[in-house]
């Protein structure tokens, strides 16, 4: 549901056996793994949508993505009724959207953001990294390099969001294989663009 017509649903990396072993090693008792037809009947026509938070960043180029994310996550919460749910900070916009959804709809669950986990060379871990060949994998390191540059500029006292994001873009653009969708400084809660690097702020890029 959160995948668009030309996106990678069919080829998205899945390894249930590996996931199950990791869960078992972590002490998990039960894995919830429904079939698509169990979650979405032929008559399914109800969706969760949101204004504002889903129109910036990834929402501009993937207009139905967050509607799908919110719908499937809310269904999961209703079925499983968890006390806590964990979402990676790597997708900061998704985390903000889910937090807003559970607040607005009075869902009794605590949303916890999990820090980004990186490979030894700095690349953020992601199931989609398997799509990269050796050359692309090496080129992708420019992303973590841009993050470090932004952090250094902010630590050195640069307060202008435009100055920091411009410097990050210029670094990424030096990598021939890189294609920038956006590099933006936004409020971490509202996902609205900001002009100053003042908390709560994050720089999102794709």
Regions picked out by a protein language model, each given a short descriptive name:
Residues 1-179, 185-198:
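Nucleotidyltransferase catalytic core that binds NTPs
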Residues 145, 205-206:
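Long, charged alpha-helical interface segments
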